Amino acid sequence: MLACLACAPAMADETVSIGGSRAVLINPKAPRASVILMPGADGNIRPGDQGDIHGLTGNQLVRTRHAYAARGLAVLVVDAGTDLTSAVQYMAAIKRPVTVIGTSLGTIRAAQGIARGARPDALVLTSGFLSMESGSSQNVMSILGSPSSLPRTLVIHHSQDSCRATLPAGVEPFVKWSAGRARAVWVSGGLNEGDPCQAGGHHGFNGLDGQVVGIAAGFH
């Protein structure tokens, strides 16, 4: 058993600096692609010195970061202040294609980064602030204005997400607006515990991590 573990490729988490902002990198041997994970809430992951994360540890993207790496992806977990253009360039130097994956308020920050010129190869929006129908006047559509800068986009949404700013009703208007650039995948089931806008609810895909990672990791 120990010999087998010793044969497994090491995937050490490390803290890196991108444009003066700290982020956490997990770089497996010979990655097949790269992902940039943009957590929700305030986005402050509070990276330590050795690739450790002290903030938003329950967030769906933070808690599943190693699952993405286990699927052969180079993973960068960014802090709220990380410049997305710089992050995309950093990961492109490791392995393209580069997919940005944002969840909840992270979808707002992803859209803001794209509006400022970031050009990932693909975008995954989970539990997203997508359109006015999502429940928030600030959303991906309002930030981008036009779908022309939208890369190939996958929306992953829980059919029973009851968070007031990411309602399921917001998905179809966004997909229609995207002019063929976006498609949606719905998930259901899992657990719904606590605040409907937090990680323990359907909004945070509680109990569905493996399914969500599998869908997102396959889109690049």
Predicted regions and their residues:
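The feature captures the conserved acid-bearing segment of alpha/beta-hydrolase catalytic domains
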Residues: 127-189
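N-terminal cap/lid segment of alpha/beta-hydrolase-fold proteins
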Residues: 11-30
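C-terminal catalytic histidine-bearing segment of alpha/beta-hydrolase fold enzymes
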Residues: 181-220
